[in-house]
Design a protein with these regions (language model features):
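C-terminal secondary-structure termini that scaffold catalytic or DNA-interacting sites
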Residues: 224, 235-237, 243-255, 262-264, ...
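N-terminal DNA-binding module of tyrosine recombinases/phage integrases
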Residues: 9-14, 19-107, 112, 274-318
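C-terminal catalytic core of tyrosine-transesterase DNA break-rejoin enzymes
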Residues: 148, 200, 204, 210-211, ...
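N-terminal core-binding DNA-recognition domain of tyrosine site-specific recombinases/integrases
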Residues: 61, 73-145, 149, 171, ...
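C-terminal catalytic core of Y-nucleophile DNA break-rejoin enzymes
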Residues: 226-228, 246-270, 287-305, 316-340
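Short, charged phosphate-coordinating catalytic segments
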Residues: 2-3, 144-156, 182, 200-233, ...
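Catalytic-site neighborhood detector that most strongly recognizes the C-terminal catalytic loop/helix
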Residues: 168, 176, 233, 359-360, ...
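DNA breakage-rejoining catalytic core of tyrosine-based enzymes
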Residues: 107, 153-155, 165-187, 230, ...
Length: 424
């Protein structure tokens, strides 16, 4: 290193390098007693590296990138990320990153090689841009933590890594439900209380699908007309106790309080009255659930599994789930699967999803004149850019209205007269 100077003092060598000035005076670190110049140089390089790392000794990591990826999943992901995110990252690592980069040492991977990897992936696969971004996010995250969190590498080679410019085939746009489609769906399923009420809840609140089916009656104040959104559900591999879990909302801002319209409030009151009647009708055959705590397969994170009550667990606190079948059975988001097959095939409303009600709600509310900041808050977004980029779409009606409004704004006698001159 050019910063480390080696000097011979008598029969031995010393290293010397300058450090930050103190009190306006130049300061140096030196050490003598080395028999050879090369010994002094090596020791000086190590000392200088420790100095620029604020006194933390730096040891070159001999881990393969493959082993480090496992280390990162076990030590960072399991403590900081949600189960589904960990599963998604593990899939990306095992399918795309490990086979191409895993054999190299972590410390030998350079920004050039990482850029080559990203380019190869983008050329070889036709994923959506968002999925390419997820691959990039994993690569950048692993190297960021290797450098800043664990000190395995001195510099972060992924710091400036980015996706190349590329033409991504556009997917089908999100479906914006028309009022005619909503009416058609509600009429078709007018006798399916659970689906109809869950559909209305999403339609009138813009809640995420997982948030809708995580609702309990304790979250809904029918007297004040408000819903407290605190949880979301997610599923895992099914076992004897089921596969549905109650987790936190997608983001911290996802926890929110939303007001219920009179239409939805009336529907929820009627639905609850019928559910209470069915509980009495089924008696001890009605199915109830409770929450069971346990650690996930990755270690420390406590999960809350939705478990059916038995004779042994009948004294557990009941989870008053809102959207269940007539006998109380909870099937999570699966309750929408069959209805949407009917919607696609019988009603002819193709390529629509339950989740699209969220985007339809956002678009309609914004077009009604509500400020975008308020819309973002109602949807549980951290920033308005998410609302603008992913959930707010224009409609033929809104574009026609905008054109008509602009036409009225610039109307004048001169323009009208000019138009008359253009008549053939």
């Amino acid at each position: 290193m050019a910063q480390v100077n080696i000097e011979k003092r008598g029969n031995v060598y010393q290293y010397r390098f300058e450090i930050a000035p103190q009190g306006g005076k130049r300061k140096f670190i030196n050490k003598s007693g080395f028999k050879t110049k090369s010994e002094a140089q090596e020791a000086g390089n190590i000392a200088y590296t420790e100095y620029i790392n604020a006194g933390v000794p730096f040891k070159e990591c001999k881990l393969s990138y493959s082993d480090y990826l496992d280390y990162w999943l076990d030590n960072y992901c399991k403590s900081n990320l949600k189960y589904n995110t960990i599963c998604k990252y593990r899939t990306i690592i095992d399918k795309y990153i490990r086979p191409r980069l895993g054999l190299y040492r972590l410390s030998t991977l350079t920004s050039v090689r990482l850029n080559m990897f990203i380019t190869e992936i983008c050329d070889e696969y036709s994923f959506s841009r968002s999925y390419f971004k997820n691959i990039l996010k994993v690569v950048k995250g692993t190297f960021r933590d290797a450098c800043n969190l664990y000190g395995f590498i001195k510099y972060n080679p992924a710091l400036t890594l980015r996706l190349p410019k590329m033409d991504i085939e556009k997917k089908d746009p999100k479906h914006l439900y028309t009022q005619e489609e909503i009416d058609k769906i509600l009429f078709r399923f007018r006798y399916n209380d659970t689906f109809t009420c869950s559909f209305l809840t999403s339609c009138y609140t813009g809640m995420r699908t997982g948030e809708v089916f995580a609702l309990t009656w304790d979250d809904i104040d029918l007297d004040k007309g408000v819903i407290s959104i605190k949880h979301s559900i997610y599923d895992k591999a099914k076992d004897i106790k089921g596969r549905w879990y109650l987790g936190s909302t997608k983001t911290l801002s996802g926890e929110r309080l939303i007001y219920i319209s009179q239409t939805l409030l009336s529907a929820l009151k009627n639905y609850k009255a019928k559910q209470d009647y069915l509980k009495q009708l089924y008696g001890n055959k009605y199915i109830y659930y409770y929450l069971e705590d346990g650690k996930n397969q990755y270690g420390k994170v406590i999960e809350k599994r939705i478990v059916q009550k038995t004779e042994e667990t009948k004294n557990q606190i009941t989870l008053n789930l809102v959207f269940t079948k007539s006998d109380g059975k909870f099937t999570g988001t699966d309750i929408t699967k069959y209805p949407f097959e009917i919607i696609h095939k019988e009603l002819g409303i193709e390529k629509c999803r339950f989740y699209d009600l969220r985007g339809s709600y956002a678009t309609k509310v914004l077009n009604s004149g509500v400020e975008i900041r308020d819309v973002a808050d109602m949807l549980g977004h951290r920033n308005i850019e998410t609302t603008e980029n992913y959930y707010v779409s224009s409609t033929d009606t809104s574009r026609k209205c905008a054109t008509d409004n602009f036409d009225k704004m610039i109307q004048s006698e001169v323009i009208n007269e000019i138009s008359e001159y253009l008549v053939f």
